[in-house]
């Protein structure tokens, strides 16, 4: 994906949400787990909240409160978009130096196990870390991962 453009952030966020491994070992180290959980919840619930907030005012014939209910509906609809936006920004953020070293160690460990990977990135981003973590949890056994988790 591209890291420029308004709509690409949402697309990158959705892709990153699908790529990030939902493992309990990662939850204390990264906020992604909580953001992904909240975003998935918002995708399911917030459209209903938006519709209910407008329909209740229409059913009770309260036209004076209709503008406020529309604002509430717009806010409710924006909640999942905010999650996708945050995830898209996070996916395209370059890793800090400590995580770059961890990324390289994991990459090397996966290569040593005999798995094929795309070439090592010199300036990896969080989406690259998500891909490597996915591969590590699928390819490596628990003893190889004990050092990090």
From Swiss-Prot:
Localized where? Cell inner membrane
Report the membrane topology from the UniProt record. Multi-pass membrane protein
What keywords appear on the UniProt entry?
Cell inner membrane, Cell membrane, Membrane, Transmembrane, Transmembrane helix
| Subcellular location, principal | membrane
Entry superkingdom: Bacteria
What residue ranges are annotated as transmembrane? 41-61, 69-89
Q: Cellular component terms, GO, for this chain's entry? A: plasma membrane
Q: Name one Pfam family in it.
A: DUF412
Q: Which InterPro entries is this protein grouped with?
A: UPF0208
Q: Which residues form a coiled coil?
A: none
Instruction: Tell me which HAMAP family the record gives.
Output: UPF0208 (MF_01101)
UniProt family annotation: Belongs to the UPF0208 family.
**Name of this protein:** UPF0208 membrane protein VSAL_I2111
Q: Which organism is it from?
A: Aliivibrio salmonicida (strain LFI1238) (Vibrio salmonicida (strain LFI1238))
């Amino acid at each position: 994906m591209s890291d420029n453009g308004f709509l690409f952030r949402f697309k990158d966020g959705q892709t990153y949400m699908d790529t990030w491994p939902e493992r309990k070992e990662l939850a204390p180290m990264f906020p992604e787990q909580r953001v992904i959980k909240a975003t998935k919840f918002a995708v399911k619930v917030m459209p209903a909240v938006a519709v209910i907030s407008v329909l209740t005012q229409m059913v009770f014939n309260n036209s004076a409160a209709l503008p406020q209910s529309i604002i509430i509906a717009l806010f409710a609809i924006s909640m999942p978009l905010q999650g996708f936006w945050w995830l898209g920004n996070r996916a395209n953020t370059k890793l800090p130096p400590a995580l770059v070293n961890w990324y390289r160690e994991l990459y090397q460990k996966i290569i040593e196990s005999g798995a094929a990977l795309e070439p090592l990135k010199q300036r990896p981003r969080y989406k690259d870390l998500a891909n490597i973590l996915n591969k590590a949890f699928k390819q490596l056994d628990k003893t190889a991962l004990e050092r990090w988790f």
